[in-house]
């Protein structure tokens, strides 16, 4: 079955690479990531999203609208993240500056695949802050009538034609889970970028 084929073999990676099993408020020692190539991200998000049957799916931002940021490489099969920081400590810092800080520390910004894994394992993370995922970037920037068909609230002005937007996960409307996007230079007191120390795969 799926677990025996894809997940159980990852156990051998833990024996060599981690002894830390302490879960703290903003620190998660280990996460299993199932990438879009194995299980579509929209399906994963729908299984996690609360009250999904009450929401019109055509107005939901789709995970497939994002791709890895330049220079970011992730496995195409299930893998592990070690030493995950949820982004709580990075609040009030724009995603672009967070990426630079992560690079200086030898850490990696989480992607949209990894963010969905994070809130699937630990949904309580979103009770304290929005989780920005600058390891991915928005690739679809729709305009005109197609905006509403694709789920965006408004078209992007010309000045943003070359701007970079990154995915963000948050709770709105009484714990309704939402995937959206944020400009990479936006600084907010309720949003922070998540990161990990390493990615491990077989």
Q: Can you name each region flagged by the protein language model?
A:
Residues 1-108, 115-202:
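A binding-site-centric feature that preferentially detects glycan-recognition modules on secreted/surface proteins
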């Amino acid at each position: 079955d799926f677990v025996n084929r894809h997940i159980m073999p990852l156990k051998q990676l833990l024996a060599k690479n981690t002894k830390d099993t302490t879960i703290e408020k903003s620190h998660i020692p280990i996460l299993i990531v199932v990438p879009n190539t194995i299980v579509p991200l929209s399906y994963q998000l729908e299984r996690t999203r609360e009250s999904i049957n009450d929401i019109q799916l055509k107005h939901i931002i789709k995970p497939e609208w994002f791709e890895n940021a330049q220079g970011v490489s992730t496995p195409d099969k299930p893998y592990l993240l070690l030493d995950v920081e949820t982004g709580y400590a990075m609040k009030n810092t724009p995603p672009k500056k967070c990426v630079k800080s992560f690079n200086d520390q030898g850490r990696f910004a989480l992607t949209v695949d990894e963010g969905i894994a994070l809130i699937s394992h630990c949904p309580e993370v979103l009770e304290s802050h929005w989780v920005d995922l600058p390891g991915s970037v928005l690739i679809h920037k729709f305009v005109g009538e197609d905006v509403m068909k694709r789920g965006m609230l408004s078209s992007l002005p010309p000045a943003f034609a070359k701007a970079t937007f990154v995915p963000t996960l948050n709770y709105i409307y009484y714990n309704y889970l939402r995937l959206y996007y944020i400009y990479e230079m936006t600084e907010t007191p309720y949003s922070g970028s998540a990161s990990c120390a390493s990615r491990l795969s077989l």
